[in-house]
């Protein structure tokens, strides 16, 4: 208790003041504040919940299925294009196997784009027996032999190459090495068969 004397107009007044100990107010008693906090928390929770849900939905919607389907579609389309161009070449070549000038005729018949694409298809699908058949390989080897005959360096070797058009047997073997073919005759390497975007050649 505190006693206070106050002088007013030469008169003293005595006041007893009761001092109470401070009491800590529990925040849980403040319902208004708790309600606001709760409301804010609720809205935050609801907002985050909605955001998470949307995020999960978006994540699920971006799958690899679409990209896989597109890739398979492109591969199938490329395979069909390869088969079509190769059939065009085979149908054209089958009546010209004895032509000593067959490569020059081939070059003048088909555009550089077609020749370049044909070479690329045969190189790419070389190990696919459904696309690169024994018949195609026989025609391909005849074409290579014809190119070799027009090159003085390989004329003698070309004269020793045998290709059976009925059984497709040949002593000329081809091995794919990246974007070119390595040619062997009786297991001996003889040259490389290449393409430069315009012409076929051996080196």
UniProtKB/Swiss-Prot annotation:
It comes from the Viruses. Residues 32-70 are annotated as: Disordered. Residues 39-50 have a biased composition (Polar residues). Residues 53-70 have a biased composition (Acidic residues). This is Uncharacterized protein R321. It comes from Acanthamoeba polyphaga mimivirus.
